[in-house]
């Protein structure tokens, strides 16, 4: 009985650790008030997907310009087609778009992309959608 409990605890630990390792890493590179657009700011970030990482369904309430730096990613907006992007390719999300698929295209290799957001000053970068 004790052996089964130990195995269960180890498996739970491994599964939890694996799930936690699958989260995207977001790094803010620059934020700038846009004086010609009162109340707006530009935010430049990088997003790194570990191998197999996926995003929750969300929106940005912003204009989001995506540029793939490394690896490949899969993106899809509600009502749109799923697209696979490789280094040098771009993607756009509008303020009203719901992002239903965002993930690394390769379960064994990470991916990295640059995102320029034009958004309301102080607004959240990502808003979960149910």
Question: What do these predicted ranges mean?
Answer:
Residues 63-75:
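Short, conserved beta-strand element in jelly-roll/cupin
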């Amino acid at each position: 009985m004790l052996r089964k409990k130990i195995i269960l605890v180890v498996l739970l630990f491994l599964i939890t650790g694996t799930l936690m390792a699958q989260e995207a890493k977001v790094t803010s590179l620059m934020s700038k008030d846009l004086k010609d657009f009162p109340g707006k700011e530009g935010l430049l970030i990088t997003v790194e997907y570990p191998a197999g990482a996926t995003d929750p369904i969300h929106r940005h309430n912003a204009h989001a310009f995506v540029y793939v730096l490394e690896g490949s990613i899969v993106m899809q907006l509600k009502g749109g087609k799923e697209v696979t992007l490789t280094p040098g390719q771009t993607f756009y999300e509008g303020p009203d778009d719901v992002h239903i698929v965002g993930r690394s295209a390769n379960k064994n290799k990470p991916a990295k992309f640059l995102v320029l957001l034009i958004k309301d000053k102080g607004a959240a970068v990502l808003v979960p959608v149910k």
